[in-house]
Amino acid sequence: MIYAGILAGGIGSRMGNVPLPKQFLDIDNKPILIHTIEKFILVSEFNEIIIATPAQWISHTQDILKKYNITDQRVKVVAGGTDRNETIMNIIDHIRNVNGINNDDVIVTHDAVRPFLTQRIIKENIEVAAKYGAVDTVIEAIDTIVMSKDKQNIHSIPVRNEMYQGQTPQSFNIKLLQDSYRALSSEQKEILSDACKIIVESGHAVKLVRGELYNIKVTTPYDLKVANAIIQGDIADD
């Protein structure tokens, strides 16, 4: 089976003084989360589309789904965890409790606050994860990347044509991800905040799918302005 895991567990601290977590803020008069869910509903391959949100915001999430007529029976809401990977594991726990987990099950995990992903990106994630077990969505780095250990001096400049910026979705064979996460120590779980990094550390290859420049993550007030400009300018190509 194929599942979507929508990660809506953030509280939006970088958004500043706002009354709601960032996933519930509006762009073009509609919550960011709803824009994102609408993209996933269009993909018939998904057996379930599972939104993980802070426990105290579950009722609000269910209310806005009703308000915006998200009636697709595949959409479920569960409580997120204390961090990104724990949230993904909560989604997997839901899957295991409801349907069990089969060897070829795939989960497509995606930031709720990336509302501009395309059908191509979603479907390529499904195809590549089903074939290879793990995939990340990336774009080539445009700017030169510099590294600094002391935040004052450059200690390394990586080769730019080997650098990519990670986006989401990140998609996995569920058993591979679950087994790789369970093998981590408590210390590793605190350090390895990215699911693809967990797979890399396990020794399994992670394939790449091409993202889009406009597949932005809306985390700051500036991002919110850019997101509205993308919609109003019809920049995102689906």
UniProtKB/Swiss-Prot annotation:
Its EC number is 2.7.7.40. The record marks 160, 217 as: Positions ribitol 5-phosphate for the nucleophilic attack. Catalyzes the transfer of the cytidylyl group of CTP to D-ribitol 5-phosphate. One of its GO terms (biological process) is cell wall organization. Heterodimer together with TarJ. Keywords: Cell wall biogenesis/degradation, Nucleotidyltransferase, Teichoic acid biosynthesis, Transferase. Pfam families: IspD (PF01128). CTP binds at residues 7-10, 81-87. NCBIfam families: PRK00155.1-3, PRK13385.1. The keyword Transferase applies. The record marks 14, 22 as: Transition state stabilizer. This is Ribitol-5-phosphate cytidylyltransferase 2. It comes from Staphylococcus aureus (strain NCTC 8325 / PS 47). Pathway: Cell wall biogenesis; poly(ribitol phosphate) teichoic acid biosynthesis. It catalyses: D-ribitol 5-phosphate + CTP + H(+) = CDP-L-ribitol + diphosphate. Belongs to the IspD/TarI cytidylyltransferase family. TarI subfamily. GO terms for molecular function: 2-C-methyl-D-erythritol 4-phosphate cytidylyltransferase activity; D-ribitol-5-phosphate cytidylyltransferase activity. Coiled coil: none annotated. InterPro entries: IspD/TarI, IspD/TarI_cytidylyltransf_bact, ISPD_synthase_CS, Nucleotide-diphossugar_trans, TarI.
